[in-house]
Amino acid sequence: MAFVPPQAGYDRAITVFSPDGRLFQVQYAREAVKRGATAVGVKCKDGVVLAVEKRVTSKLIEPESYEKIFQIDDHIAAASSGIIADARVLVDRARLEAQIYRLTYGEPVPLTVLVKKICDLKQMHTQYGGVRPFGAALLMAGVNEKPELFETDPSGAYFEWKAVAIGSGRNTAMAIFEEKYRDEMTLEEAIKLAVLALSKIMEEPSPESIEVAVISVKEKKFKKITPEEVAKCLEEALKEVEAEEVPEKEEDYSELDSNY
């Protein structure tokens, strides 16, 4: 008889807890996020920034078709890491919920309301048979009364951050944020910090492999940064990387067990 690992029985159904209180399928979904391209978000006094690493695996791929930052509403955006197809389903649901709220109440949806709805959907996919957890995490950013930045976990948990990263480069980016983030940063400084974090993670950073979007407090409108602006920020970031050592990783941010 073939040997069956002790945890195998708990792997076969999403609704079954292991004896130590874990849902293995949720943990595997988190592993999919850890393998994904890095996405970062930075909140500042006059807006919020999202930036992502675009892993273009072939020179034949049109970089513009490889979208990793999505506009949800005029004032809300999302960046993804993990399984792109799963992220697209979550983004489509977020867009639908934003439209329903606007038609129902005649005003833009608050980001906190939208984040909760998306995380409720994620949580449902950890509780019912016949489904699996979403193998994607989202950074959701927006401006209603003030800039806000949330991370959504495959488990359905969500956290608000000043600066955060998801994906394979999370620990390195978080170490940079811990060292360099300031509450009084301007939007321009936040863009540079986000690009700096990605440039340290990527082997060959280029303007074509970094996507950046911002939402400012003044305009409350989603806007993607042009490749020329990204190139300028990247040039400054690479000079800074050469000039100083990046701090060592002191803390592991790869998994937040606030669910237990």
From Swiss-Prot:
Annotated spans, Disordered: 241-260
Keywords annotated in UniProt: Cytoplasm, Proteasome
Main localisation: cytoplasm
Bias type Acidic residues, positions: 242-260
Cross-referenced InterPro entries: Ntn_hydrolases_N (IPR029055), Proteasome_alpha (IPR050115), Proteasome_alpha-type (IPR023332), Proteasome_asu_arc (IPR019982), Proteasome_asu_N (IPR000426), Proteasome_sua/b (IPR001353)
CDD domains referenced in this protein's UniProt entry, alphabetically: proteasome_alpha_archeal (cd03756)
Signal peptide: none
A cellular component term, taken from the record's GO annotations: proteasome core complex, alpha-subunit complex
GO term, biological process aspect, one: proteasomal protein catabolic process
Single GO MF descriptor: threonine-type endopeptidase activity
Xref: Gene3D superfamilies: Glutamine Phosphoribosylpyrophosphate, subunit 1, domain 1
Activity control, per UniProt: The formation of the proteasomal ATPase PAN-20S proteasome complex, via the docking of the C-termini of PAN into the intersubunit pockets in the alpha-rings, triggers opening of the gate for substrate entry. Interconversion between the open-gate and close-gate conformations leads to a dynamic regulation of the 20S proteasome proteolysis activity.
Compartment list: Cytoplasm
SUPFAM superfamilies: N-terminal nucleophile aminohydrolases (Ntn hydrolases)
Protein task: Component of the proteasome core, a large protease complex with broad specificity involved in protein degradation.
PANTHER family with a match to the protein in the record: PROTEASOME SUBUNIT ALPHA/BETA
NCBIfam families: arc_protsome_A (TIGR03633), PRK03996.1 (NF003075)
Assembly mode: The 20S proteasome core is composed of 14 alpha and 14 beta subunits that assemble into four stacked heptameric rings, resulting in a barrel-shaped structure. The two inner rings, each composed of seven catalytic beta subunits, are sandwiched by two outer rings, each composed of seven alpha subunits. The catalytic chamber with the active sites is on the inside of the barrel. Has a gated structure, the ends of the cylinder being occluded by the N-termini of the alpha-subunits. Is capped at one or both ends by the proteasome regulatory ATPase, PAN.
Family to which the UniProt record says this protein belongs: Belongs to the peptidase T1A family.
Name of the protein described by the UniProt record: Proteasome subunit alpha
Source organism of this protein record: Thermococcus sibiricus (strain DSM 12597 / MM 739)
Gene from which the chain derives: psmA
